[in-house]
């Protein structure tokens, strides 16, 4: 990248209690908050290096509760990328991606790309937790990938704030999606229509194992 450092505004959205704030705190401080405090993350801005590119990454946290529905879209102005999160142990948060969040994002920011993120990966296969929480419903990787296709997200990543698995990958991926020129994104879409070979994907370098699907 040449010239001035590019500023990227990244806004996290999703149902309340899916772990958006925890994800941001873990990414910026490498610490996992032990107590749940709704949306206490201050807006964050710092220079980040990804694949040799230095960008100034701005992170915006939003509250998912209905009480904030009128105020929340104010954070969307100027967004370059959305990190749309749902919990891998909450069927309701998964379903709300289509029912609630996509209509809202497409109304207020129709052309902004999305990275879909499944949070609380460490609990999906945690048998004792699932046994103690009958209302919990595990979402599979295949279901997450299907949702990614439905909403047209640029990538799908599963992560855990508690173990910090793939936390950095979430935001590295968001940065890479923004840095990829729009023309190239269009070419990627056309390539996928013409061939099913994975080698035609210009986002191939975003792959980060089985928990990250592009």
Curated annotation (Swiss-Prot):
Localization terms from the record: Cytoplasm; Membrane
The keyword Membrane appears for this protein: yes
Family per record: Belongs to the small GTPase superfamily. Rho family.
Record's keyword terms, sorted: Cytoplasm, GTP-binding, Lipoprotein, Membrane, Nucleotide-binding, Palmitate
Residues reported to bind GTP: 14-21, 61-65, 119-122
UniProt organism field: Oryza sativa subsp. japonica
One family name in Pfam for this protein: Ras
Post-translational modification comment from the UniProt entry: May be palmitoylated.
Gene Ontology annotations of biological process type: actin filament organization; cortical cytoskeleton organization; establishment or maintenance of cell polarity; regulation of actin cytoskeleton organization; regulation of cell shape; signal transduction; small GTPase-mediated signal transduction
Entry membrane topology: Peripheral membrane protein
Alphabetized NCBIfam families for the sequence: small_GTP (TIGR00231)
Motif (Effector region): 36-44
Gene Ontology terms, MF aspect: GTP binding; GTPase activity; protein kinase binding
Principal cellular location given in the protein's record: cytoplasm
Gene symbol of the encoding locus: RAC2
Protein name in the entry: Rac-like GTP-binding protein 2
One of the record's GO cellular component terms: cytoskeleton
Function: Inactive GDP-bound Rho GTPases reside in the cytosol, are found in a complex with Rho GDP-dissociation inhibitors (Rho GDIs), and are released from the GDI protein in order to translocate to membranes upon activation.
């Amino acid at each position: 990248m040449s010239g001035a450092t590019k500023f990227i505004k990244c806004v996290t959205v999703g149902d309340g209690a899916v772990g958006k704030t925890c994800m941001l705190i873990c990414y910026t401080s490498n610490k996992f908050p032990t107590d749940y405090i709704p949306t206490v993350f201050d807006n964050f801005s710092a220079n980040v290096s990804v694949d040799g590119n230095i960008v100034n990454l701005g992170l915006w946290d939003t509250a998912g509760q209905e009480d904030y529905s009128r105020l929340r879209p104010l954070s969307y102005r100027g967004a370059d990328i959305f990190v749309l999160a749902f919990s891998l142990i909450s069927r309701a948060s998964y379903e709300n991606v289509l029912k609630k969040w996509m209509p809202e994002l497409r109304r207020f920011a129709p052309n902004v790309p999305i990275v879909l993120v499944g949070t609380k990966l460490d609990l999906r296969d945690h048998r004792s937790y699932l046994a103690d929480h009958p209302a919990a419903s595990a979402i599979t990787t295949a279901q997450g990938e299907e949702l990614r296709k439905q909403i047209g997200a640029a990538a799908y990543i599963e992560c855990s704030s508690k173990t910090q698995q793939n936390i950095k990958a979430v935001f590295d991926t968001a940065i890479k999606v923004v840095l990829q020129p729009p023309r190239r994104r269009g070419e990627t879409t056309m390539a996928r229509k013409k061939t099913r070979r994975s080698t035609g994907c210009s986002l191939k370098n975003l792959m980060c194992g089985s928990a990250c699907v592009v």
